């Protein structure tokens, strides 16, 4: 420690007597020697002279270097004049300042490592480079963290298969916040659209179902009407039949006609029916409604039954049309009754024909 402080003091004295450039160069060489001491040497007077001689020897080649008062640095331009003035003014402070870093650097020197610092510009460059490296290292660390966080996503997307449930669950959990709203927005409108589209269909189906009884009633009414029309003649034939019947009735009621008028085809029978019976069996027209004539077979049977039950009326109607009034059957019935009573009383048969002839003569 004592050697280094004395050497520095001597170097400061030499720098005072030299020029500004030489003092700067000597200070730089002193700094070189300060950092480049390989091993601590014992404090001997001969060693101090040798150390001082070495400093002078090293200072002479420095004179041969080109003189430059300005050195470029990373942050700007730096001159050597200011440090020389500072060194001239405070030599004691420099000695004390140089002694302090020697204490801190001694462990490095003992380790056998000799780091020769370069001039101020290069030191600044190294400092900036180290800062850049630190910044890059710090930026690389989060980037590595980001890659580590992103890799599971890539692996999950690449390994996403039915056989890898963990990757699928990781992907689902990581993308649930983004995917769920999209799925809801994409799926809900179709559902709402289908619901709205289905409601009119349901409403249309409900009125159809509600109206089905009415339709069935209408169909049943139509079917019953069709059955009646099937049993009766066709609709197109009905107006024609009605027209023919009305025409025949009009012709039969016309004056000057004493002969009976033939009935229409539907009411035709082996015997010509009188006008009254014919009108009774003819269909009657009611206001605006369709007239459905009775069945032909039923009408014929009814006419025959009426003739069998009321033969006298038929004959009377026929005789009325011809203008003759004869009550033959009434007389025949009376004669038959009288003959029966006589047979019971006398036991003799009476000729009905003779009795009838006598009655007619009388």
UniProtKB/Swiss-Prot annotation:
Residues 16-30, 220-229 have a biased composition (Polar residues). Transmembrane segments: none annotated. Residues 1-169, 183-362 are annotated as: Disordered. Residues 55-67, 90-106, 121-139, 146-161, 304-347 have a biased composition (Basic and acidic residues). The modification Phosphoserine is found at residue 161. Keywords: Phosphoprotein. Residues 110-120 have a biased composition (Low complexity). The keyword DNA repair does not apply. The keyword Phosphoprotein applies. This is Glutamate-rich protein 5. The gene is Erich5.
């Amino acid at each position: 420690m004592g050697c280094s402080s004395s050497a520095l003091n001597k170097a400061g004295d030499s720098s005072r007597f030299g020029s500004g450039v030489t003092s700067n160069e000597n200070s730089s060489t002193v700094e070189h020697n300060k950092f480049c001491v390989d091993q601590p040497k014992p404090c001997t007077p001969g060693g101090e002279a040798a150390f001082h001689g070495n400093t002078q020897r090293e200072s002479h080649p420095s004179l041969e270097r080109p003189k430059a008062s300005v050195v470029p640095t990373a942050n700007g331009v730096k001159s050597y004049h200011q440090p020389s003035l500072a060194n001239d003014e405070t030599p004691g402070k420099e000695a004390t300042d140089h002694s302090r870093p020697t204490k801190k650097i001694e462990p490095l020197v003992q380790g056998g490592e000799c780091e020769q610092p370069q001039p101020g510009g290069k030191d600044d460059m190294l400092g900036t480079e180290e800062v850049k490296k630190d910044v890059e290292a710090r930026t690389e660390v989060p980037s590595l963290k980001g890659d580590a966080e992103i890799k599971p996503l890539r692996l999950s997307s690449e390994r996403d298969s039915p056989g890898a449930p963990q990757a699928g669950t990781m992907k689902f959990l990581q993308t649930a916040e983004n995917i769920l709203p999209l799925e809801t927005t994409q799926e809900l409108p179709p559902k709402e659209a289908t619901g709205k589209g289905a409601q009119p269909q349901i409403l249309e189906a409900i009125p159809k179902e509600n109206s089905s009884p009415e339709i069935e009633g209408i169909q049943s009414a139509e079917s019953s009407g069709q059955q009646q029309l099937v049993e009766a003649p066709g609709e197109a034939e009905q107006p024609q039949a009605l027209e023919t019947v009305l025409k025949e009735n009009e012709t039969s009621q016309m004056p000057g006609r004493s002969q009976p008028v033939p009935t229409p085809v539907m009411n035709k029978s082996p015997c010509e029916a009188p006008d009254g019976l014919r009108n009774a069996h003819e269909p009657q027209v009611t206001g605006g409604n369709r007239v459905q004539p009775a069945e032909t077979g039923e009408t014929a049977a009814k006419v025959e039954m009426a003739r069998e039950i009321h033969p006298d009326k038929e004959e009377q109607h026929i005789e009325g049309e011809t203008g003759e009034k004869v009550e033959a059957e009434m007389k025949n019935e009376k004669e038959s009754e009288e003959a029966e009573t006589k047979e019971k009383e006398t036991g003799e048969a009476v000729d009905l024909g003779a009795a009838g002839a006598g009655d007619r003569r009388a």
